[in-house]
Amino acid sequence: MAAASTNRLRLLYTSTRASLPQSTPSILTTRTYATTDSSTSATSTPKPRRRTAFTDKLNAGPSFGDFVSGNNDNAPLIDPSEAYALETALVGPAGRKKQMTRLPPWLKTPIPDSKNYQRLKKDLRGLNLHTVCEEARCPNISDCWGGGDKAAATATIMLMGDTCTRGCSFCSVKTSRRPAALDPHEPENTAEAISRWGLGYVVLTSVDRDDLADGGARHFAETVRKIKSKAPSTLVECLTGDYRGDLDMVALVANSGLDVYAHNIETVEALTPRVRDRRATFKQSIAVLEAAKKANPEVITKSSLMLGLGETEEQLEHALAQLRAVDVDVVTFGQYMRPTKRHMAVHEYVHPRWFEHWQRRAEELGFLYCASGPLVRSSYKAGEAFIENVLKKRRAGVSDAVAEKKVAAAVDEAAR
């Protein structure tokens, strides 16, 4: 039975095949290559794509030529100068756009790429040193590191690592409860780098190290002594933390051989809890500056404030009065610039004329010097040029008043 069924299937297949028209197999006679001339290539009709609402809308919209020529009648024309003058801009995806404040033109700086910048960076990496210029994303880095002479090539060395135990809302330095151990070779390496550069003035600062019993004060003092040993003519400014209010540690650093003791109050008293870490208070910072002056009356004391955080004129007047009450010699004002979106937002970009106003006000109150401007930072080189000259005049036995007059031109030149 199975054999009969198989025979019937064979007969059906044979008869069906015989009834179909016989065709000769097609032979491919042409080949197409990526470089074949279009005249010799086999022509093929592309498969049409499925139309979508997005495609229709895109095709019906303005072309590139419309954007270039400005022939879009549906949108008002904006002069390029007006476009750059816009103070705010909407950014983000549709439905979630946020209004962001544009950076005003007086705060824009060039990207650092000079040979001197690369040389300083290479030296720092080779000696495993850190700078606040890089860690805090200072906008002046191209200016301070870009020059070829000692006045223009200024670096602020950050001691005790690149990780802080505190987390201020304005600062971009890394934070941790337990940073890495101190590098015992750092004081020697720092002194070696500074003597190699031949700078007349150097700024040392540090992260806060609340994990250490002395807050790193002895490490700081040892670095100053090493620098003075290798480069005795170099003037040293130390921008320190508050050492958790331990005034004995403040005195230790103040008597280490430095020339300028700096500690920043950062902002006015009313805004301090919001701007700074909870362990840093306005009154504690004032006490640090007072203790430094008492420990070493010959040392120049210095502090700095950021503007644009929402402070009022009355609050700034109060802050300046508190600084003068403890005989602070130098004060600087600079614009707060948000380092990342995770940090505190800028309340306002203060116009340069207000920085001029606060410079005049500080001088009226009796400060020895005030550097004030949107891009001024606590280690700004114009202030350093002034302090450097004043200290050298002091060493030569010239009075402060005479020194101020003689270096006024140099200060103005450095500020430019």
UniProtKB/Swiss-Prot annotation:
Residues 20-52 are annotated as: Disordered. SUPFAM superfamilies: Radical SAM enzymes. GO terms for molecular function: 4 iron, 4 sulfur cluster binding; lipoate synthase activity; metal ion binding. Binds 2 [4Fe-4S] clusters per subunit. One cluster is coordinated with 3 cysteines and an exchangeable S-adenosyl-L-methionine. Its main location: mitochondrion. Keywords: 4Fe-4S, Iron, Iron-sulfur, Metal-binding, Mitochondrion, S-adenosyl-L-methionine, Transferase, Transit peptide. This is Lipoyl synthase, mitochondrial. It is found in: Mitochondrion. SMART domains: Elp3. Its EC number is 2.8.1.8. It holds the Pfam family Radical_SAM. CDD domains: Radical_SAM. It comes from Aspergillus niger (strain ATCC MYA-4892 / CBS 513.88 / FGSC A1513). [4Fe-4S] cluster 1 binds at residues 133, 138, 144, 379. Its cofactor is [4Fe-4S] cluster. Residues 147-368 form the Radical SAM core domain. It comes from the Eukaryota. Residues 29-46 have a biased composition (Low complexity). Transmembrane segments: none annotated. Belongs to the radical SAM superfamily. Lipoyl synthase family. Pathway: Protein modification; protein lipoylation via endogenous pathway; protein N(6)-(lipoyl)lysine from octanoyl-[acyl-carrier-protein]: step 2/2.
